[in-house]
Every structure is written in structure tokens, then in C-alpha cells.
């Protein structure tokens, strides 16, 4: 199954039955089920509103929304001019969230992101005190543009905010507003003079989302829309409080043990030192995915199932989020590069070879 294929809704096969079993043991009450239905309707409305401004990019939009409702952060990889900034700014308007764009440059300092303390004098008493001036990180939606163009010290300040949802300045911790979502961008072409994110920091991003060129028909529509001098109005669908409530619902969606075991087989099959790893994994990978991949596969599958109006997770949900979760967590070696094998190729083969049901040979995928 390729990333471009939209996984089907629940089917009547064994995968669907596994998901339904989880639904029977649901921790969601009647009120929660109403909230699930509301999120499905809101998702369709958000997609319709985004469609007024954004042409195409359906997978990108779905994956960004999944990561938001799963309380994750995403790394967006694509060449300039593919509407990355427009997507995020438009989405923040649909969700009634504050938006901030940070352009990462080699001279950007951590305080330029987090904020700084300044001395403020009381005119009445003459007393001087420190006052914290918030930086651009204090917004609900952050676009970290070209994150690999700034030094590691500044990258670390952003990553602390992502992980801890707070910043440290002057020895004091300052909580960030919720909901909080970071979307960082990278240009895959220009790598000279950049500071690539190490694997340990890449692992903190829930999704690695690829933005490709539009199709011919989509590009025609883009030219028609952007050369007439009119800007479409976007309606607000949700607000921050509702998003936080929906994020809590996503966390409570039950997952059948069989689906959890399926996720485990997928991730463990990428680890070259494990017996479960197929031969082609050992031939093509230098390193595999860690436990955080399994966690994000489950969270992403939960969020997707709710966006599609279901209160249980199926294997199709896992497969739909496998590409953005795994592509930056598996490291190809020189043999794979020499043979033209990409992470997408490897992930696709893993999905094809890994059984959904436990056959008694956990991880016994076809060797290559």
C-alpha cells in the first residue's frame, strides 16, 4: 500500500473485527461518542474551508490535522513555493488559533525565539525589576521555517519548547499556551551551510510530511486562483478549548491488543539487530525505529479513526500513518542509496510483508 492510496473505511475482514472488538470495550461514554461525531463533522468542514484557499495537498492536510489532534509536532519537507506557510496560516484561522512564523537563520539566537528579560523602572518609586518579554514561540501554532539553517543551540531551544511545552529564561520557566503545535520546514535541495537535525531530535517530531509538486490540473487551478486579486474568506470551525477537549477524546480511544501487536511487529521489523528483521532490512538500513515510533503509530491511528468518525482503531489507520511516522526514524545505508532504495520503498514493503494477525511467527516477514 503506497502513501498516496487512501486507506478504506472499516471493512468486514479480520482487521475490522479486531477494531470492533476494541469498540465493544470502549472507554468512551455516550457524551464522548457525540464528541467523536462532532470531530468527524468538524474535520469535513475544516477540509472544505481549507479547500477554498489550498489546492490539492489532501494527504498533507490530513496528516497535519492528525498530528494536531494527537498533540504531536510535524516536520514538513518540500521545496520552496509549495504553500507550506499558506497551509499553516489558513489552518490556524480555521481553528481560531494564534499563529507565529519564525524564519530560522544562522544568526538567530535562542532568546529571539523564547523571549528575553528586560529591566523595567517604576516611575513612581524608581524601583527596577526584570520583566519577561515573550518571544514568537508564545503562540498556538508555530511555523519554524527552515529549521536546519540555525545552529544547534537555537534548535535546542525550540525542541525544549516542543517537548516540555515551556521555555526557560533567566532561570525561570514560562508555560506555553495550549493547544501548542510546531510545524518545522526543511528544504531537501539546498543543504550547504545548514545544520542537519540529529536523529535524536528528529525523533521528537511525530510526523515527517512530504510536500510534493501539484498535479497539472491542480497547478492550472492554482494559477487561476492566485492571479485574480481575490482572497477567499475562511470561517472559524473550532476554537482552542474545543481542540483540547478533542485531543483528550483521542487519547481515550481504545485499541485492541491485536492492533498493538501489529504495530509492534512493524517497528521491531525495522531493527537490524533483532531476529524479527527481514534480510532486506539488514541489507538496506543502518538503524531502525525506536519505541517512540510505536507510540506515535498508535496515537496517529487513534486520531485518524476519530477523524473518520470511528471509536476504535483498525490496522488501516496504522498503515495510513506509517509513512510519516517511520520515514525519519529509519536510516538507510550506502547499499540502499546505491540501489536507489528510499525509506518509502522500505516502509511500503514492510506494510506488505508484515501480517496484521499474529501468525505465531511474530515479525516473520518475507526476506529479500
Each predicted region: which residue ranges?
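Conserved C-terminal "switch" segment of AAA+ ATPases
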Residues: 32-39, 53, 194, 208-280, ...
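Pre-Walker A (pre-P-loop) alpha-helix and adjacent loop at the N terminus of AAA/AAA+ ATPase modules
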Residues: 35-82, 268
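Conserved alpha-helical scaffold flanking the Walker A/P-loop in AAA+ ATPase domains
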Residues: 63-66, 122-143
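Walker A/P-loop
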Residues: 68-106
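Canonical AAA+ ATPase core
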Residues: 120-125, 150-154, 162-253, 302-304
